[in-house]
Amino acid sequence: MAATDHEVEEAVAKAREDDKSRRQVDGFDAGKAPPFRIGDVRAAVPEHCWRKSPWRSLWYVVRDVAVVVALGAAAAAMDSWAVWPLYWAVQGTMFWAFFVLGHDCGHGSFSDNATLNSVVGHLLHSFILIPYHGWRISHRTHHQNHGHVDRDESWHPLTERRYRRLPPRAKKLRFTPPFPLLLFPLYLFYRSPGKRGSHFLPSSPLFSPKDKGDVILSTTCWCIMLAFLLAMSCAFGPLQVLKMYGVPYLVSVMWLDLVTYLHHHGHQERLPWYRGEEWSYLRGGLTTVDRDYGWINSIHHDIGTHVIHHLFPQIPHYHLVEATKAAKPVLGRYYREPHKSGPLPLHLLGVLLRSLRVDHFVSDHGDVVYYQTDHHLNDTTTDDAHKQK
């Protein structure tokens, strides 16, 4: 039954009142348009940070491939259950590093040579069962619409109406680890809730007709890698392939989901999401969050410097730290300094758990909205939600 105009007006008023308490921290309004333009941020970044070196980028590929090969050879030679868990953790992290380099290829920050980017991107992403062009195109949509409730592509919030329609079991799974950390393969096939399409089919709503050849090429490469894994299973046994490749692959998926989620969620400041005329590329990009991963920063190519990356994805990863330092005086309070990590970023697990307890949906109404909490989802949400008000 359609809502009356009066009911809609009441809902809008309630949403604004609910969000008002979330909006200000120490007098700072995170949802207010910043006093600077994106050109001001761009001008603060040193000129050399924009330069791409294909040789330097290829060096990182060679380095990571050498580490992956060495780890695989060592684990296969020792073949000990005392070693396998350590191998899975380290090799899975290296698979994730492959993703980040392929991600740079997709943005064109790897080099100015589109052919080189495509070749390297396909090799790296096909190895970890990602259709390179299919993902590249959807990720471009994510960057072009970051922070937009309706148009963002990945990890965008559920509206309250859509959230209420989810079956109880679906709600529980979505916000209960480890399921949220295993969603990426499903996303490749089915996209996010409320969106249709697959990253493998050129007929998907994700793509335009001109993308057809690229999508078919990447899906073919994905199928070749899958066939290779099946052949290895026949030759050496499925258990050996599971130990050498399958478990590290799952670890890399967990890294991918953890990092991409926490770059857009979990900050104590309760960052805004936008609709309509309130959204802009700059305001959407400023809702992203930098994270510190300790000594893993260098292993996964400084992916934690996410704010500047989202504003200027063409900057190579090896310049992102310097570019971030240069831009911080311009960004001011719109840049949130990441919590300093220990050697291992174990603190981020607490951030993830807290966010999953309180960040459930946004209002159906309003152009500047904030995550709200379903207090009935589990017994621990209420206290956490009240602490944030």
Curated annotation (Swiss-Prot):
Keyword Membrane carried by entry: yes
Protein name (database record): Fatty acid desaturase DES3
Sequence motif Histidine box-2, residues: 139-143
CC annotations in GO: membrane
Segments of skewed composition (Basic and acidic residues): 1-26
Molecular-function annotations in GO: acyl-CoA 15-desaturase activity; omega-3 fatty acid desaturase activity
Catalytic activity, as annotated: (9Z,12Z)-hexadecadienoyl-CoA + AH2 + O2 = (9Z,12Z,15Z)-hexadecatrienoyl-CoA + A + 2 H2O
Organism: Sorghum bicolor (Sorghum)
Transmembrane parts of this sequence: 58-78, 81-101, 173-190, 222-242
Tissue localization of expression: Highly expressed in root hair cells. Barely detected in panicle, shoot apex, stems and leaves.
Domain of life: Eukaryota
PANTHER family noted in UniProt: OMEGA-6 FATTY ACID DESATURASE, CHLOROPLASTIC
Record region (Disordered): 1-29
Motif position, Histidine box-1: 103-107
Motif stretch (Histidine box-3): 306-310
Encoding gene per record: DES3
Biological process according to GO: unsaturated fatty acid biosynthetic process
UniProt free text on domains: The histidine box domains may contain the active site and/or be involved in metal ion binding.
EC number in record: 1.14.19.13
Record localization: Membrane
Topology of the protein relative to the lipid bilayer: Multi-pass membrane protein
Keywords of the record: Fatty acid biosynthesis, Fatty acid metabolism, Lipid biosynthesis, Lipid metabolism, Membrane, Oxidoreductase, Transmembrane, Transmembrane helix
Class in the EC hierarchy, top level: oxidoreductase
